[in-house]
Each structure stands twice: as structure tokens, then as C-alpha cells.
A protein has these predicted regions:
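Extended ligand-binding regions for polar small-molecule ligands
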Residues: 43-52, 111, 119-133, 209-248
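Ligand-binding cleft/hinge of the Venus flytrap
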Residues: 47-54, 134-158, 188-192
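Periplasmic-binding protein-like
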Residues: 25, 100-107, 189-227, 245-259
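Extracytoplasmic small-molecule ligand-binding "clamshell" domains
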Residues: 11-82, 158, 223, 238, ...
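Acidic, polar ligand-binding/catalytic clefts
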Residues: 47, 51, 56-120, 201-202
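A ligand-binding cleft/hinge motif common to bilobed small-molecule-binding domains
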Residues: 66, 82-91, 137-141, 170-204
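Alpha-to-beta junction loops
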Residues: 55-56, 73-81, 124-125, 161, ...
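Immediate post-signal peptide segment of exported/extracytoplasmic ligand-binding proteins
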Residues: 6-37, 113-114, 119-125, 254-259
Length: 259
């Protein structure tokens, strides 16, 4: 009986004993390459979850817009790529929340233009990574709050990866970059003061989750169980402290999902 259950539990994972994840490994500090190996918060998080299930984890480097199609095409068991939980995404996949975050605005330190929120972006060139969840919100804002009120639209430039957006900012192809708060902090540190964060408050607060296929209850249940087990460990607490990140509370799940 037990053996049958064990083999059943492995049946829905691509490789027995392994959680295969799709990750866009260009997005420090969540997932990035370090000495030829995937590193970062999401990578360590999944390792901890896998270990608590007696499994190992593998991250398959995949560009962000290809993650959901890859998941649906069974190239991997889950997506593990700091993916924001949105109503749009929940129509096509299920998501398991594990982190709370939001966006910040970054500009060159010596720029006169230092917007604090999208209201100051009408008529300006803004750079962002393609496929991000807040893009629709920004486009809608440009239409409803800029154009409809007789102001020039926000010019939004999309780039394949986040570092390319920062490059565009440095070369003045865009005037500001909107990116995840943790990524923004990393960019400021890495560029040693060449860029600054100009927004105080978190824009578009969201939950981040692992993506799982809707028709795959085995993987979903295993991930939820692994996360629950891992969250009770010191290692989990230390992981959040190391990255200065915020774990998800039951309250967050209620309020942010409602919004």
C-alpha cells in the first residue's frame, strides 16, 4: 500500500524525486547566475521546500514570457520565478503564494526627473521588463489619467530582461525604470550611487507565488505541504532575514487577493 502511494506521489513530477522548475535566471536577487550556478532567494526557497519533501530541485532557465506556456507544455513541474499572482494568471494556472512585494521607480542620480508615482509619468519615457504584471495597470493609467485628461501619454519601452532596462536607463534611452523593490535595491547597490530609488511607497503591492498546472493536483498538494513544512524551520526564517524579505501572512492573502 505505502509503495503504491509513494510511486503515485512521484507520478506527476517529470522526474521522480526532483522538482523541475522554470525560472528566468536574470532577475537578482530572486534568481540569477553566480559562478555558473543558479542562485538567489527563489532558488534557495525551492531547495528548502524540496528538501522538506525529501526531493531535490532543478531550475530550467527560461525567459519570463515563456514560463507559463512552458509549464502548460509540461517542460517543468512548476514556475519558480518571482511571478506576481494576478487575476489574469489565475485564469490559466494555479499559484501558491510565498512572498509579498511591489514596485519601485529608479532614475539616474543626476536626473532632474525623479517621479514618486505614475501620476508624474505622463509624457515621459519609462522602461520595464516585458511580461510583467503591472504593465497593463501602467498602460491603463496612461490612457485614463494622462491621455483622457489632455496630457501626453506615458511612453513605455519593454525589454526582454531587467538588466537591459537598467542599461537603457544608463544610456538615457528611458528616463525611469519601474521594477520590483528588491531588484531596485540591488541595482542601486551594484551601480554604487549612479541610480536612485525615487518612490517612497510600494507601487502595485502583490503576492509572489509558484505556478502550478490546474490539472495537476499532485504537484500542487506536494508544493503546499513542502512550503508548510519548510516555513516551520529556522532555515526559512534565516532565508527571509538574509534577503530582508517579507513572508506572506493569511491576512495578506485575503486583502491582496481581494484587490
Amino acid at each position: 500500500g505505502l509503495l503504491a502511494v509513494a510511486s503515485q506521489a512521484n507520478a506527476d513530477f517529470i522526474k521522480p524525486g526532483v522538482i523541475t522548475a522554470g525560472s528566468d535566471i536574470t532577475f537578482a536577487p530572486y534568481e540569477y547566475m553566480l559562478n555558473g550556478q543558479p542562485a538567489g532567494f527563489d532558488i534557495e526557497m525551492l531547495k528548502g521546500i524540496a528538501a522538506s519533501l525529501g526531493k531535490t530541485s532543478v531550475n530550467v532557465d527560461t525567459r519570463f514570457p515563456n514560463l507559463i506556456p512552458g509549464l502548460q507544455g509540461k517542460r517543468f513541474d512548476i514556475t519558480n520565478s518571482s511571478m506576481y499572482i494576478t487575476a489574469e494568471r489565475l485564469k490559466v494556472i494555479d499559484m501558491i503564494p510565498y512572498l509579498k512585494t511591489g514596485e519601485k521607480i529608479v532614475t539616474l542620480s543626476d536626473s532632474k526627473y525623479k517621479p514618486e508615482d505614475p501620476a508624474e509619468m505622463c509624457g515621459h519615457k519609462i522602461g520595464t521588463m516585458a511580461g510583467t504584471s503591472f504593465l497593463q495597470g501602467l498602460m491603463k493609467f496612461s490612457q485614463d489619467s494622462c491621455v483622457a485628461k489632455g496630457k501626453p501619454a506615458i511612453t513605455i519601452s519593454e525589454y526582454p530582461t531587467d538588466p537591459q532596462v537598467t542599461q537603457a536607463l544608463l544610456s538615457k534611452a528611458v528616463e525611469a525604470q519601474i521594477t520590483d523593490v528588491a531588484v531596485a535595491q540591488g541595482v542601486v547597490q551594484r551601480l554604487k550611487g549612479r541610480v536612485v530609488i525615487t518612490s517612497d511607497k510600494l507601487l502595485y503591492p502583490v503576492l509572489i507565488g509558484f505556478g502550478v498546472r490546474k490539472d495537476d493536483p499532485v504537484v500542487k498538494k506536494a508544493m503546499e505541504e513542502g512550503l508548510s513544512k519548510f516555513s516551520k524551520t529556522t532555515q526559512y526564517k534565516q532565508l527571509f532575514e538574509k534577503y530582508h524579505f517579507t513572508p506572506v501572512t493569511a491576512e495578506d492573502i485575503k486583502t491582496i487577493k481581494a484587490s
